[in-house]
């Protein structure tokens, strides 16, 4: 992220006077972040994206009042397409959902319609929202990323390897062409707005020249001090691998740990791809 882009993001920092939890419904709490801020750095045009994808959100702290004033709880799933103009700053979504806690809705469908209306306006695109009862969610099995884990390598990591560096992927491919899926649970980046850590697991599926595992792991570890949104991080990984490794096909899927009652799980791909939207062990 350039200094100019970082300064631009500062205007999106939440006003401290707004961070206190509101008990009255307020859709104005939602903070959109233009996707173009980071895509311009990557040389991506929103008119012709080099990938398809979506951002899977899980809303673990969804609560409201029914028409009798009785509190209700549920778990929500939200899918935002990568073509949306904006992403949502996660803390603002948390504050927005909290503003619903003391709001009466005549039905679960009215709540869902309200969420869809407000979030659609925020991202300037359609959104899919599903509300699950706790009993329904109890049946959702834990997902284990398929693929070969690259984390258990006997390599030395120096302090300068914790500074983001796309060039770690330079000359990182071998002549042999393969179709494989690689997994790492060591991804960590930081929120540009709150500076809080974001812990994630990444699954990289590709067909092309074999990617050197050590180089790839060093590259992923270099995000450790980097300030970048979840959605931007997956696009950075996708674009860097495409640029330096030149695969014919590529799919990148990252599932991030829950923070503030929310988890965000973005994926990007240049092929027909339908990732499984289920929680990992750390989620």
UniProtKB/Swiss-Prot annotation:
Name this polypeptide is given: NADPH-dependent 7-cyano-7-deazaguanine reductase
Pfam family for this entry, one: QueF_N
Which gene codes for it? Answer: queF
Which compartment or compartments is the protein found in?
A: Cytoplasm
Q: Which UniProt keywords apply?
A: Cytoplasm, NADP, Oxidoreductase, Queuosine biosynthesis
Species of the source? Baumannia cicadellinicola subsp. Homalodisca coagulata
The EC code for this enzyme is: 1.7.1.13
Residue sites binding NADPH per the record: 90-91, 259-260
Q: Which HAMAP family match?
A: QueF_type2
Residues noted as binding substrate in the record, renumbered to the chain: 88-90, 230-231
The source's domain of life comes to Bacteria
User: What one GO molecular function would you report for this record?
Assistant: preQ1 synthase activity
